């Protein structure tokens, strides 16, 4: 422990706790504070509580965080940090622990002396968790004692009291989310596990243990998972890229501080063609990028360009190919993780996940520029491999432009015209319209007849959709099935510069783009192919909240005069339990299994899958970009075994047809 840390440890007391506002507002308008009141908001409570412990870890005082999902769906988070101060708060005249737990925005993270940087996107602190819980209990291990206070809906039940002695330090929080506020109070293990894994990678050396005490249907308990990454981002980039083939061996890594900004980067080049950069600020995934990402891209391109200009062999290759290398070319087949720590981050953008601090751009440029120049000089073999891939990317980019232009020449209408197979809607206001991408001609026929022509368009997809995970950029524009989708929805490329790979959605023709496929394994594979196309080539559509998946029913259950469509095996069982159980005349039960969309007549398809009043739509979102990247590369990659395991685990219908 450094002298500075020792002084901080001794001085972390009530005077470091800053107070900003009260809790009533949180219960009145919870979505303002945690994003929403559905599954996402529910899991945000865990993140907000764990962030307190991560702040202790980033300050150098905590090495182990234990997260437990209890049998009653409450959550316990315990760390071995210094423990929240319990002495009296000067202004509030009550225990600092009570202030932290009951006043919004109160905490060490708002006092620069306690934490130089602090995690948490909303930064509302653990008091917000308290306000949105029916019950919460805080225990602090500090000064040789165990201090405790309990709360109901954010209000203390008694003053902070000593309930025992201890020789350890740290904080333990347990909370029960309020079912009158959240639409669900059931925690999903996988969502919590993904975030804990991410935090362990972003904070090298810390150990996070995740335990689920809820037994499964057979009464078995899941084994606790321990997340620990000694090498941090180096392990993270390997994890994200584990289904791809690296062309440079070990990741290129840097960990430094420039202009007061701690910067960490790990990157790999692989044999694929997509660019996957995941950026973080204070452990927050900046999905929309920002100044740290801009600085990284500029420095990387500059270093590689300088190297290829100064190397005779590479320079001759570029001259022979008659190409001009563009910035995008330097990032084809690149996977990178960038993590910066910023004392006062300014977030911008649609989802407040874009870093706006201008000083970070220069700091990252310096750090990455120096590290890349050194690496390229010391690793000439790898440097040549990367630069040769860049030259190939530039060649493919020019081929893509030609392919795109030839498609647009064939269709002289604006934007390349509309495909002949598109059955468009009569309404021309995009915000009121939606398009269904439907698997196969027969289902497309039913969908065309069953739709509301005023606002619903249908594009039948014939033949196999191209797996874009494994192809060069220009091949996408040569595939008719892909171009039909791009032209139908109104996405344009080359708007921000003729060779730009950014998809422009300013002239998107529909507010909702709905993938509609059969409820079987083949259907889920087609879903995945289309989602991969959007994720890799048109992520702006997903980020704008425009991509959805339709959920056709698996069964129609009829018993006497009762009839219901069932979308899951559980719903079918619930129907049987409700109407048939105990009835000796069970022969009256009729179950129709829909294997494909084409088996439904147009009225049934409208009633179950297309009518906005009844249908079940799943919105495609990218909550965790690094996790999504790893999943898509696994699903669409060459290795069959992990793909089969994933589909069997995640497609509830996979075992029905097996």
Give the role of each language-model region:
Residues 1-16, 23, 47, 55-57, ...:
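GHKL-family ATPase ATP-binding module
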Residues 395-414, 429-434, 445, 449-451, ...:
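C-terminal interaction appendages of subunits in large macromolecular complexes
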Residues 28-46:
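Conserved short strand/loop->alpha-helix "switch" segment adjacent to the catalytic nucleotide/phosphoryl-transfer site
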